[in-house]
Regions:
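Conserved N-terminal phosphate-binding loop of PLP-dependent enzymes in the Aspartate aminotransferase
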Residues: 1-229
Length: 229
């Protein structure tokens, strides 16, 4: 019951259609990467690739540290996972060039504001430009809002300030206010990619984690935290 309530509330806040709960930001970003690959295979792409950004940080699992743009995080864990194409952050032309040269791309994974990369804030047209590129190429736009989500920027999601709707969005950190819970949310076609048994998490969506996340949502609403960010 708590898991269902949390899914409904967070989807209402974000405009998403479905939720998968796990225990950390790395886990939900791993979920997003797996979803993108599954989406690619469903579209007949044999070796699906995800565009990621220089100086990004997405986690420390093998796939997410590969997606991370920091050699210090990756050092000693080679060989890294294939299936990623890297572009400079805040450079639409570079992503356009990848679109023209690489026909195995199925998604973009990007932070609306880079945190560990140095608090890099993109130009106002960057996220809308990525949304347009994804629409034109039938890619998924996947936003890592582990750092920026949960009312930290004046809206529940940072991308909402740019008027951008992602296909997939990930949440953690402030989502449970210190309790280990994360969410991978998806909408439209992306929400229908996984079927029964496609993915799982032993403790994902456990009652205590969901209760903590619901209490955080209550506090955000009752204390008008978006107005005070």
């Amino acid at each position: 019951k708590l898991q269902q309530e949390l899914a409904h509330r967070v989807c209402d806040l974000t405009g998403m259609d479905g939720a998968f709960f796990a225990n950390s930001g790395a886990e939900v970003n791993e979920t997003a990467i797996k979803l993108a690959r599954h989406y690619g295979h469903q579209r007949g792409v044999t070796n699906p690739s995800v565009i990621v950004m220089e100086n990004a940080f997405h986690g420390r699992t093998l796939a997410t540290l590969t997606a991370t743009g920091n050699r210090r995080v990756q050092a000693g864990f080679e060989p890294l996972v294939s299936g990623f194409v890297r572009a400079p952050f805040n450079d639409l032309a570079a992503v356009e060039a990848i679109a023209e040269a690489n026909h195995d791309v199925v998604a973009i994974l990007v932070e609306p504001v880079q945190g560990e990369g140095g608090v890099s804030i993109p130009d106002p047209d960057y996220l809308p430009g990525l949304r347009d590129l994804c629409d034109r190429n039938n890619w998924l736009l996947m936003l890592d809002e582990v750092q920026t989500g949960n009312a930290r920027t004046g809206t529940y999601l940072a991308c909402q300030q740019a008027g951008v709707e992602p296909d997939v969005v990930t949440l953690a950190k402030g989502f449970g206010n210190g309790y280990p819970i994360g969410a991978c949310l998806a909408r439209g076609e992306a929400a229908r990619v996984f079927g029964p048994g496609s993915h799982g998490s032993t403790f994902g969506g456990n009652p205590l984690g969901c209760a903590a996340a619901l209490a955080v949502l209550d506090a955000i609403e009752q204390d008008a935290l978006t107005d005070r960010a």
